[in-house]
């Protein structure tokens, strides 16, 4: 079949004026037409198809001009005055030979010659005009191919280069019989040659034709050759050309033009991944993704090598992304908080989840939700006990080995990450990076509701719960709920009275290790902040600033209900509970509630019998400090 395709071109007959004359009897279009089967048409290259089109166009137009078009059935043959593209659709369409069983060709882009006559009208070629003249013989021809054939016969050459032929046609297209210009009927423009007018008129015709067929003739000839076994597949394929999208998902309103694509798209919502790699077990939503994975990861050589560390990667894109770990490049910047990312996927996930508050991955065991799927997978190991790494010092368990190694530094005292600005050292690199933002003033996590910014993402997430009202951490003893797990753990120590961190100097106990470290500065006088007014020392600059308000009388925090002012914001928050009626601190023994935590602690001493305040004169003990102060006045009055 391939050999037949190579010799197809010379067998196409060319109709000349000498061949078509009314005196020679009726000649039908069928007599000179050449038809190809679907298989034969597929073997032609683009140049051969173009030649077929041009020859058939010239033959058909020439026969129509001399009135010899008799190949049309009588009931469909129009009059000479009304000959149009629609009336000769049968004569213009080449037969596709024996049809393929159950084959349905795409009607939008099939490669057939159904636009021969329309193209002739579109180009504006008139049969009685002969714009092509032979320089050698002076003979005139209606078509360039006739001129070329005539010149080949005169010179004996069978092949003329395309460049020489084009130049010859351009130089010989003027009509010397008249000095009249050729006007365009659509716009006020004249042309000295008929060829110039014809070329100009194609611009108008193309626009009209684009409205009729949504594509130009040239695009339709070479765009699509797809053949389908079932009619339903043709219908779905034609939606590619029409833009129709028949399948719509109700939840999100996304439209797709194929049922297959619609089913594949639904997997993104139900997390179905039916295509599993038989080598590594990784699953994928789409079959083509699985094929690409197997070719890229398991079969293809890793030919892209990083010059920094020597790591080999399977694609140039992966190499570019990997090199960002060395050069620190983070090209994807969030326009909300300014945070930058190395990978586009991480950037998109950040925008979709962090700022919207969406947490789509929910643990089926405890109901806790997560932003990323890998966070949920990591969390589920808490329930399954999978891959737990236990500390030999304290027995604490970790999901990852690296987390255990980091934890060991607490026992060894190793702090390898040191701040170059202040010399402070940290166990984890992440903590160092967060600490450095104190020096730079960077606060990349910005709340889109109130505009407050944060150094750490954990602080930002905890702050978001203030707006949402979410209190996911509930005390099992009293039912009180908290925004963060850390706050819940602190609260638990109220019930257990646990103060595991004890000062070796004075024996005072603390709930948290950080509080003990702050307290120990008082004994070591390390980095103490002293008040210039009274000489009192504080372990933190923040505490000193709060204390100095005592001397200045500054009370910047004012209650909007009653106008009362306070030195500290925490005092204002506690005071506002008087107006709201909120009493969050409940006694577990008698269910009495209090506004302030210290009042609850004092009250609980009634039940426990604890009396920590002892008089130095008589040894009498009290459960409240002010009771001791009032008692001591008795001894003052007794003194002479």
Swiss-Prot record:
Keyword line: DNA-binding, Isopeptide bond, Metal-binding, Nucleus, Repeat, Transcription, Transcription regulation, Ubl conjugation, Zinc, Zinc-finger
GO biological process per UniProt: regulation of transcription by RNA polymerase II
Main location: nucleus
Entries under InterPro entries matching the protein: KRAB (IPR001909), KRAB_dom_sf (IPR036051), Znf_C2H2_sf (IPR036236), Znf_C2H2_type (IPR013087)
Cell compartments where the protein resides: Nucleus
Residue location of crosslink Glycyl lysine isopeptide (Lys-Gly) (interchain with G-Cter in SUMO2): 223
Superkingdom, natural source: Eukaryota
Domain KRAB positions: 27-140
Keyword Transferase recorded: no
First and last residues of each zinc finger (C2H2-type): 217-241, 247-269, 275-298, 304-326, 332-355, 361-383, 389-411, 417-439, 445-467, 473-495, 501-523, 529-551, 557-579, 585-607, 613-635
Record GO terms (molecular function): DNA-binding transcription factor activity, RNA polymerase II-specific; RNA polymerase II cis-regulatory region sequence-specific DNA binding; zinc ion binding
Matches recorded under Pfam families: KRAB, zf-C2H2
Keyword Nucleus: yes
Single GO cellular component term: nucleus
PANTHER family: FI01424P, ZINC FINGER AND SCAN DOMAIN-CONTAINING
Homology family: Belongs to the krueppel C2H2-type zinc-finger protein family.
Protein's job: May be involved in transcriptional regulation.
Protein name per Swiss-Prot or TrEMBL: Zinc finger protein 549
Classification of source organism: Eukaryota, Metazoa, Chordata, Craniata, Vertebrata
Gene name for this UniProt entry: ZNF549
């Amino acid at each position: 079949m391939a050999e037949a395709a190579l010799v197809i071109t010379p067998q196409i007959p060319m109709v000349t004026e000498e061949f078509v004359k009314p005196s020679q009897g009726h000649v039908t279009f069928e007599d000179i037409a050449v038809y190809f089967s679907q298989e034969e048409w597929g073997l032609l290259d683009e140049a051969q198809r173009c030649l077929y089109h041009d020859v058939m166009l010239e033959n058909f137009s020439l026969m129509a001009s001399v009135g010899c078009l008799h190949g049309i059935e009588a009931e469909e043959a129009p009059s000479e005055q009304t000959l149009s593209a629609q009336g000769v659709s049968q004569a213009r369409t080449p037969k596709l030979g024996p049809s393929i069983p159950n084959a349905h060709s795409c009607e939008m882009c099939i490669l057939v010659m159904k636009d021969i006559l329309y193209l002739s009208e579109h180009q504006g070629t008139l049969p009685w005009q002969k714009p092509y003249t032979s320089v050698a013989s002076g003979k005139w021809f209606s078509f360039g191919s006739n001129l070329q054939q005539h010149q080949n016969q005169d010179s004996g050459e069978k092949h003329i280069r395309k460049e020489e032929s084009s130049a010859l046609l351009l130089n010989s297209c003027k009509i010397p019989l008249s000095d009249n210009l050729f006007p365009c009927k659509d716009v006020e423009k004249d042309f000295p040659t008929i060829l110039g007018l014809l070329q100009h008129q194609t611009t108008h015709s193309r626009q009209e034709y684009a409205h009729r067929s949504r594509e130009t003739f040239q695009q339709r000839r070479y765009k699509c050759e797809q053949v389908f076994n079932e009619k339903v597949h043709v219908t779905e394929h034609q939606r590619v050309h029409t833009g129709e999208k028949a399948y719509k998902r109700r939840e999100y309103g996304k439209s797709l033009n194929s049922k297959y694509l619609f089913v594949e798209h639904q997997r993104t919502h139900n997390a179905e991944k039916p295509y599993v790699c038989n080598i590594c077990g990784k699953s994928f939503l789409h079959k083509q993704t699985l094929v690409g994975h197997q070719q890229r990861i398991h079969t293809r050589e890793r030919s892209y090598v990083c010059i920094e560390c020597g790591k080999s990667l399977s694609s140039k894109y992966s190499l570019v992304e990997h090199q960002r770990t060395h050069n620190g490049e983070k090209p994807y910047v969030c326009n909300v908080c300014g945070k930058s990312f190395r990978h586009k996927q991480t950037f998109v996930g950040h925008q979709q989840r962090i700022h919207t508050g969406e947490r789509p991955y929910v643990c089926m065991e405890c109901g806790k939700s997560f932003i990323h799927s890998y966070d949920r997978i990591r969390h589920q190991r808490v329930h399954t006990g999978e891959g737990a790494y236990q500390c030999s010092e304290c027995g604490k368990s970790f999901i990852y080995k690296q987390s255990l190694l980091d934890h060991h530094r607490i026992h060894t005292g190793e702090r390898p990450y040191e701040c170059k600005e202040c010399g402070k050292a940290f166990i984890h690199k992440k903590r160092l990076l967060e600490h450095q933002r104190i020096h730079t003033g960077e606060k990349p996590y910005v709340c889109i509701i109130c505009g407050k910014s944060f150094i750490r993402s954990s602080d930002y997430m905890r702050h978001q719960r203030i707006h949402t009202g979410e209190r996911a951490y509930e005390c099992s003893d009293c039912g009180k709920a908290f925004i963060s797990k850390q706050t819940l753990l602190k609260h638990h120590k109220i019930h257990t009275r646990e103060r595991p961190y004890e000062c070796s100097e004075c024996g005072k106990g603390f709930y948290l290790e950080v509080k003990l470290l702050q307290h120990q500065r008082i004994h070591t006088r390390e980095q103490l902040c002293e008040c210039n007014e009274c000489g009192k020392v504080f372990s933190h600059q923040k505490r000193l600033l709060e204390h100095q308000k005592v001397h200045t009388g500054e009370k910047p925090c004012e209650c909007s209900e009653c106008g009362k002012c306070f030195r500290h914001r925490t005092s204002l928050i506690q005071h506002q509970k008087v107006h709201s009626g909120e009493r969050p601190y409940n006694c577990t023994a008698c269910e009495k509630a209090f506004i302030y935590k210290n009042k609850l602690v004092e009250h609980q001493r009634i039940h426990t019998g604890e009396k920590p305040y002892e008089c130095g004169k008589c040894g009498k003990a009290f459960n409240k400090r002010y009771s001791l102060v009032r008692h001591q006045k008795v001894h003052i009055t007794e003194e002479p």
